[in-house]
């Protein structure tokens, strides 16, 4: 009797282990065609995002406007990340890659319908060139995050013929920032 119970317990433990193995493998898989923001952010932070593309030039996941609110949730995290899915030429100007700034770039790319710029770096509007000295400070990036949040919140309310707001669809309007 005891060996029969022990055998059944062993069978159940085996089934549970197999099920746990398969479910844990699928949770961390990132699908570029149907991306999940949480998985994207976690893999960027851990450096485990598999960049897809040819010749080491990555391409962006197919995020949509439905993802903007979730992307904004993580945008104030200025953790340094090792890589971001853009062509390597984008990093030639140097400077650290900050998660939040790259997520804002992703949002801007969704807004425009194409890549916002050559890289996920913002510079001052009056920058003479794209050297690192013109990149935004952490405080300025956080200001840009708030501007994007205000823009997104404002987009929830319909624009009418009486709306007089030149910055209605320009998150960085009125700031001294632009995409590199």
Regions found by a protein language model. Give the residues of each.
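Bacterial N-terminal signal peptides that target proteins for export
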Residues: 2-13
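C-terminal motif of bacterial Sec signal peptides marking the signal peptidase cleavage site
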Residues: 23-24
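Long, helix-rich interaction regions
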Residues: 28, 32-36, 45, 79-180
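Buried hydrophobic core positions in alpha-solenoid tandem helical repeats
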Residues: 40, 67-75
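Residue-level detector of extended alpha-helical repeat arrays and alpha-solenoid scaffolds
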Residues: 50-53, 68, 96, 100
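Conserved hydrophobic register position within alpha-solenoid helical repeats
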Residues: 55-56, 103
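Electron-transfer interface patches adjacent to heme c in soluble/periplasmic c-type cytochromes
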Residues: 59-63, 94-97
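Residue-level signature of the C-terminal ends
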Residues: 62-63, 74, 110-114
């Amino acid at each position: 009797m005891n060996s029969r119970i022990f055998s059944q317990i062993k069978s159940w433990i085996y089934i549970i282990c197999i099920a746990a193995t398969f479910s844990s493998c699928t949770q961390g898989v990132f699908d570029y065609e149907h991306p999940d923001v949480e998985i994207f952010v976690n893999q960027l932070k851990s450096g485990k995002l598999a960049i897809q593309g040819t010749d080491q030039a990555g391409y962006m996941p197919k995020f949509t406007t439905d993802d903007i609110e979730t992307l904004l949730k993580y945008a104030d995290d200025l953790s340094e990340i090792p890589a971001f899915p853009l062509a390597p030429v984008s990093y030639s100007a140097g400077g650290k890659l900050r998660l939040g700034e790259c997520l804002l770039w992703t949002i801007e790319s969704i807004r425009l319908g194409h890549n916002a710029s050559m890289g996920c770096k913002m510079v001052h509007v009056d920058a003479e060139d794209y050297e690192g000295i013109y990149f935004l400070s952490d405080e300025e990036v956080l200001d840009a995050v708030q501007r994007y949040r205000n823009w997104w919140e404002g987009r929830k309310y319909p624009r009418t013929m009486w709306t007089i707001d030149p910055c209605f669809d320009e998150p960085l309007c009125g700031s001294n920032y632009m995409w590199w």
